[in-house]
Design a protein with these regions (language model features):
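Intrinsically disordered, low-complexity, repeat-rich regions
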Residues: 1-157
Length: 157
């Protein structure tokens, strides 16, 4: 597992250019999102090390720019696998937020939307707290507020 600073030095110029072109971003914006995506992957790979098995981490619409970039990176399977081996201590699988995480489910949404909202708010608070504790206030604000405001066309609904 490499330190965050080393992970942030990873370059994939072809991916940055392709992402900028596909999503009509400036190179500077694509590079900024790429750096945040690297931080996001490092965070996911490093959470709970030595304490419990890795488990899903909830994502919210605000993380859509990071998630979309991750999807694009995964498509370059060799580069992604090499990156994971070198910087994350092994392959980081991409899994959707698990159905039933902390009781959240589509069925609950249909039957008790208020309870579903309360669970989602609790999950969001826990996620933001964990990111703040591990990555700092600036990163937490970027991931949960600024990136999706800056790139609304990348926010999934």
């Amino acid at each position: 597992m490499s330190p965050l600073a080393s992970t942030l030095n990873f370059k994939h110029d072809a991916l940055v250019r392709a992402f900028a072109k596909k999503y009509k971003l400036s190179m500077a914006s694509s590079e900024e999102l790429f750096a945040h995506m690297l931080q996001w992957l490092w965070f996911l790979a490093n959470r709970n090390l030595g304490h419990q098995p890795r488990h899903g981490f909830p994502t919210f619409p605000a993380q859509a720019p990071l998630d979309i970039y991750w999807h694009e990176f995964i498509l370059d399977t060799r580069a992604y696998q090499d990156f994971c081996s070198t910087h994350l201590g092994g392959f980081l699988h991409h899994c959707p937020t698990p159905e039933g995480l902390e009781g959240a489910s589509h069925e609950l949404f249909l039957n008790n939307p208020q309870q579903q909202r309360e669970i989602n708010q609790m999950l969001l608070k826990k996620a933001m707290y964990e990111v703040h504790a591990k990555m700092g206030l600036e990163t937490m604000l970027s991931w949960y507020l600024h990136l999706h405001q800056k790139h609304p066309h990348l926010v999934q609904t």
